[in-house]
Amino acid sequence: MSTDSLFHRDLYAGQMAEQLLNPGPLDESTRSGVFLSGIRRVGKTTFLRQDLIPALESRGALVIYVDLWADPAKSPSALVHEAVRQTLLQLQTPGSALLKRLRGLRLGAAGLSLDIELDRLGEPGGSTLAQAFEALVAKTKTNVVLIIDEVQQTLGTDEGQALLHALKAARDAVNAKPGT
């Protein structure tokens, strides 16, 4: 489908982005996560990728997107850890497109330096998602939004449940810090 035939929902995406990044007193629960649901084939993924992500990024958020249907041979946990790892590697790579987009953060020409072990992210004895997100938010001092498309793929397996617990721990670790 060409992007010309899409029905963009820019206003809705902008309102949602604003509510997520700057929640009012009645919106504080959005800091715990938001689920977008609906019947199949109505444009949820298109909305996320074409409207919401650009709206979040235009407001300075660092967005990590992962589609759990992207590679059915990989577990949801592996896909999420890979997406986080790849984003962090891009931020550590001098001259990367992501680093350039975030140039207003004064991360330096050499890239972002994180004190975590990326090659073992999510593995036993390696860095956790909580450690990765804490370090990322502390270094960038910007909103980080993790979008997991087809999150229902995590349900029904022990590994999927463990991933959801790890994501909750990461959310709690970041949200517990003052000013985040």
Residue ranges and their predicted role:
Residues M1-R40, T46-A55:
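Walker A/P-loop-proximal flanking segment of P-loop NTPase domains
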Residues D10-A13, S77, G126, L164:
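Short, structured helix-loop boundary elements
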Residues Y12-P23, L129-L136, L167:
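Generic hydrophobic alpha-helical segments
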Residues A17, H81-R85, K168:
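Generic solvent-exposed, charged/amphipathic alpha-helical segments
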Residues L21-S29, L56-S58, E134-T140, R171-P178:
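Alpha-helix termini
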Residues S32-G160:
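P-loop NTPase nucleotide-binding core
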Residues Q153-T154, D158-T180:
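Sensor-1/coupling segment of RecA-like P-loop NTPase cores
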